[in-house]
A protein has these predicted regions:
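Charge-rich, low-complexity N-terminal segments
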Residues: 1-49
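Charged, low-complexity interaction tracts
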Residues: 32-186
Length: 186
């Protein structure tokens, strides 16, 4: 195996390890996102499909990982009911790359939240009567809140990705240079 590939693998392992560490610190470790973090190192191919020199690293995670990492801007607005009626929603997703569109939360978001609520064993209650509410109602209430307030960016993946480039740039460059020297001396 080439020194360059070894250096790329070292970088990729660092990014995954640090990303998982960040998720654990944010009390989101052990879940689907944590388990889905992975990488794959591939050798470059030319137009004809033949292998060429150099390698690429691809990182994989659950689709919603990008939203957790980079944040989502909420639509804002004012609260219509409850004790905080008339107060504006605080937008947690400031600086987020993504944003919710006007309207209501989509069904896939509500369905995902419903699954999460059941997995966590969360039981919602009606504020006035104290009665339990259905999981569907609770998931809609949470989805509506997230839709208005957004998702705060965590940069759990972006920070290690950038830090890894800074940390391993010399190792990767030296390994690539050594591989070139080895090829020229053959």
């Amino acid at each position: 195996m080439s020194e360059f590939k070894d250096a790329i693998i070292k970088y990729a392992r660092y990014v995954i390890q640090q990303s998982r560490s960040n998720l654990t610190k944010a009390k989101k470790g052990g879940g689907n996102l944590y388990k889905s973090l992975d990488y794959k190192v591939k050798q470059n191919r030319g137009n004809s499909g033949r292998f060429e020199s150099g390698y690429n690293v691809e990182f994989f995670m659950e689709d919603y990982g990008a939203y957790q990492d980079l944040g989502v801007k909420g639509i804002g607005g004012q609260r219509k009911t409850g004790a905080n009626k008339g107060k504006a929603y605080e937008n947690k997703g400031q600086g987020g790359q993504f944003q919710f569109r006007k309207g209501v939360p989509n069904r896939s978001m509500i369905k995902s939240l419903n699954t999460w609520i059941k997995r966590k064993g969360i039981k919602g209650r009606n504020q006035k009567t104290g009665r339990f509410i259905t999981d569907q109602s609770l998931s809609f209430a949470i989805a509506k809140s997230v839709f208005h307030t957004g998702i705060k960016r965590s940069l759990f993946f972006s920070k290690p990705f950038e830090a890894g480039i800074t940390k391993y740039d010399n190792d990767i460059a030296n390994a690539y240079g050594n591989d070139i020297i080895i090829e020229l001396t053959r």
